[in-house]
Structure formats: structure tokens, C-alpha cells
Swiss-Prot record:
Name of this chain's protein: Small ribosomal subunit protein uS2
GO molecular function, one term: structural constituent of ribosome
Alphabetical list of SUPFAM superfamilies matching this protein: Ribosomal protein S2 (SSF52313)
Keywords: Ribonucleoprotein, Ribosomal protein
Origin species: Malacoplasma penetrans (strain HF-2)
Length: 367
């Protein structure tokens, strides 16, 4: 056997020997995950697998050069969706409450939610959420995504309703990756009257909340100085300094200006780049909902939503759905949940061409 083949078989045997660690979370989440595992252990269909694998290579909906024609692709997606819904129908208690079709499988696949990271980056603890492997990527089992999304949605719905008399919103949304996601987190949090952090997480935001509150009070005071014209009393040099200070505070505290108490839950778009936030939440017993890619550690998250969190469209859709739960609990209109596919508008993602990335390297060329 060639050396490369030996290396591959050796690494794969080591991987299969690893055991998936079990996490201690709430009883209802444990029960849901166990039931979901039993249901998903039955493979969907060979045809369903072929659609997933073709999808992974393009990282989006199939292009004109894909193996399936568009009509055929839609038929395959419909077949996958029917299989998933049938499995849920056979296990009505799988989501803890009556199942709600929040979004179609077709829309999830359109966003690339099922496409995991490359296999070398995976965390073995995410094995139960993975459907198969295609090429260099893992494919996420959308059955788990649909079920987990329902469980998280119901949890948020009940939590916000239970805290309806509170002056402060119980939900804090954290999304710090990429300009589009940062802006979307801000928009959706404002729409659902939730708190948000879309810049770097400051250590101690939760565990040292009293100090953070003092900084927020200073920020609110600076805003007041600008609004009532009191800033004109200062010299030009002092005005410039105050403006810089205000902008610095605004960057980190704009989304939590009115947060008077600790949140009851935090929602993360990427647990891997916000590990400090997870650690603080766990220390204080605050539940964590997170969109987990195949590289995440699900043991650190209370409500895992397995999906591609490196895809702008995928995160855009899932954040919108979770914020709809908060909005619904407050009697506000929904923007994503239970809408038709054509009613859900996703951002246009423009990929830079390789030549554009290297346009500044011409200075090294010799004439």
C-alpha cells in the first residue's frame, strides 16, 4: 500500500476510535437530542445524498454547470424535505412541542446552511450532527438543523413571554464576524427590541457587569452632552477628545445602552470566535443558543443549531428566524418565520475574483 494511503487509513482509524463526549444540559434538550439522533440514524435516501454532495462543491445553489438541471434539483430538495417532515411526523414529541415549519429545507439549502467546513477542521463532538462527507467538506444533517431551530425558537418564545413585565430585554445577540452580519445583527435586534453586541466582545461584559454598567453610564452621559448642546461650552480641543471618546464607547456599548440587568439568554452566530462570551455565560448559568459549524464544541452550548455559520446567507436567515421568536413573543410582526420562500429576501454576496486579490502584487514584478 502507498505511504499516502497508509497515512489516510491510519488517521481515519484514529478518528473512529474517538468517543463523542456527552454534555450536561437541561433535561428537555437532552431528550430532544437523543430522539433526534435515533431519527437521523436512518439515512434519508441515496437521491437525497446526491443532492447534498453536489451542493457542497458550489457552496450555494447549483450552477448551470451542475449535474442536475434546476427542475431536477428542486424535485430532489422536495424529496429531502418530505423525508425530514415524515420523520418528524413519526416522532411528534421530537421538538418538545407541536412542530412548526419555520422555514423550508429548500431555503436552508439555498443559503448553504448544510455545508460544513473542511474535514480536517472538524470537531469529533459534532459527529452526530453530520450527515455525510463529500470531497473535502462535511455535510450537516438538516434534520438536526430543523429540529434544533424549532427547540430554540420555542425556548425563546417562552422565555420572552415569561419576562414580559421586565424593564430590560432578556435576550442578548452577539455577532462579530463580517460587516454584513454585524449590520444584520444590529437591525434584527432593534426590530425585536433585543440587545446586541456586534463588535469585539469585551472581557467581563457579563462577569464584571457592574464595571460595564459604569462605562455605559458614561457613554449615555456623553450622548446627553451632545444632544443638549452642552458640548459647545468646551474648547475645540476638548470637543475633539469628547467626540473620540463617544465614538469609542459607541462602538462597544451602543447595543447595550439600556441593559440594566444581565440577560437571560445569549445568542451567538459563531461560538468559536466568542469563546469568552460562552465562558462568562456558563459561569453565570446563562443559557447559550449558538449556530454551530462542524468545528464547534457542542458541549459548551445549551441549544445547538447545526448549520454553516461561515455563509453570510445562512447566518442572515437563522438570526432573522431567532429574532422572529423574540418579536412574536412581544406581539411584533415576523420577517422570516413561516414565510414563503419568495418572501424571504437574502443579501447578495459578491465574491471577489482571484485577480482582484492580487492586484497590488504587481509592484514585485520585474520588468
Amino acid at each position: 500500500m502507498p505511504k499516502k494511503a497508509e497515512a489516510k487509513t491510519g488517521s481515519s482509524s484514529k478518528t473512529t476510535k474517538r468517543t463523542v463526549a456527552k454534555k450536561d444540559v437541561k433535561a428537555e434538550v437532552n431528550e430532544t437530542n437523543k430522539t433526534a439522533e435515533k431519527v437521523s440514524s436512518k439515512k434519508v435516501n441515496k437521491t437525497a445524498n446526491s443532492v447534498d454532495t453536489n451542493e457542497s462543491s458550489s457552496n450555494s445553489t447549483p450552477s448551470t454547470g451542475s449535474k442536475f438541471e434546476l427542475s431536477s434539483f428542486k424535485e430532489k430538495v422536495a424529496e429531502i424535505e418530505n423525508n425530514i417532515l415524515q420523520k418528524i411526523k413519526e416522532n411528534p414529541t421530537i421538538t418538545g412541542k407541536p412542530f412548526r415549519k419555520l422555514v423550508s429545507v429548500n431555503k436552508l439549502m439555498e443559503t448553504g446552511a448544510h455545508i460544513g467546513l473542511t474535514t480536517r477542521k472538524w470537531n469529533p463532538k459534532m459527529k452526530k450532527f453530520i450527515y455525510t462527507k463529500k470531497g473535502n467538506n462535511h455535510i450537516i444533517d438538516l434534520l438536526h438543523t430543523v429540529i434544533s431551530l424549532n427547540v430554540a425558537y420555542n425556548f425563546l418564545l417562552d422565555l420572552v413571554k415569561a419576562n414580559s413585565n421586565s424593564e430590560s430585554s432578556p435576550v442578548l445577540i452577539v455577532g462579530t464576524r463580517g460587516k454584513t452580519i454585524k449590520n444584520h445583527v444590529k437591525e434584527q435586534a432593534k426590530r425585536s427590541h433585543a440587545f446586541y453586541i456586534n463588535e469585539r466582545w469585551l472581557g467581563g461584559t457579563l462577569t464584571n457587569f457592574s464595571t460595564i454598567t459604569k462605562s455605559v453610564a458614561k457613554f449615555n452621559n456623553l450622548i446627553l452632552i451632545h444632544k443638549n448642546g452642552e458640548i459647545n461650552k468646551y474648547t475645540k480641543k476638548e470637543q475633539v477628545e469628547l467626540k473620540k471618546k463617544t465614538e469609542k464607547y459607541a462602538k462597544y456599548f451602543s447595543g447595550i445602552r439600556t441593559m440594566k440587568e444581565l440577560p437571560k439568554v445569549i445568542i451567538l452566530t459563531d461560538p468559536e470566535i466568542n469563546k469568552i462570551a460562552i465562558k462568562e455565560a456558563r459561569n453565570l448559568g446563562i443559557p447559550v443558543i449558538a449556530i454551530c459549524n462542524t468545528n464547534a464544541n457542542p458541549d459548551l452550548v445549551d441549544y445547538v443549531i447545526p448549520a454553516n455559520n461561515h455563509s453570510i446567507k445562512s447566518v442572515y436567515l437563522l438570526v432573522g428566524l431567532l429574532c422572529d421568536a423574540v418579536a412574536e413573543a412581544k406581539g411584533l410582526p415576523k420577517a422570516f418565520a413561516e414565510k414563503k420562500d419568495e418572501e424571504i429576501l437574502l443579501p447578495e454576496v459578491i465574491k471577489r475574483k482571484p485577480e482582484n486579490r492580487r492586484q497590488n502584487n504587481h509592484s514585485f514584478n520585474k520588468n
